[in-house]
Amino acid sequence: MKSLVSCAWLVTIVALPFSQSALARDAQYDVLVATHAKANNLPEALVHRVIVRESGYRPSLVSHGNIGLMQIKFGTARGLGYTGTAEGLRDPETNLTWAVKYLAGAWRAASGDHKRAMHYYASGYYHAAKRQRHPAPPRLEELTSANAQQVAK
């Protein structure tokens, strides 16, 4: 029993710096996440969950062709209208702009279910959206055009 308590104490001491570090990174991106979540009608908690799962708040992470905070693929971002370089997706603002837009499509295809939305984000939601006849997320040009029309009114 004494060794079990000692082991638990050791695990707590070792894990504490990592959890505090993760919380510090979380706070660093709170405003950015809130802005993009609101713009795409998503719960902030869902965006944070994806970031934690995909990169642990490491914006420079590249793994198997997935890039940045939300580990979006360059081809996926290009399909949504991104015209920059793959390297540009390491920028947190750029990464969230395109990855949260993609997550919004997964969220709609999942009918608002967090767990399913995360699954669709990681594995693709094309077929689920097609079955449900959800429209594709708007491209940047469409968003810019719609905003310009609202401003003109």
Please tell me what each predicted stretch does.
Residues 1-6:
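Positively charged n-region of N-terminal signal peptides that target proteins for export
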Residues 18-56:
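Export/targeting segments at the very N-terminus of extracytoplasmic proteins
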Residues 20-29, 141-153:
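Proline-rich, low-complexity linker regions of envelope-associated factors in Gram-negative bacteria
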Residues 55-58, 76-79, 124-127:
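Solvent-exposed loop/turn segments at secondary-structure junctions
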Residues 100-139:
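Catalytic and binding regions of secreted/periplasmic enzymes and modules that target cell-wall glycans
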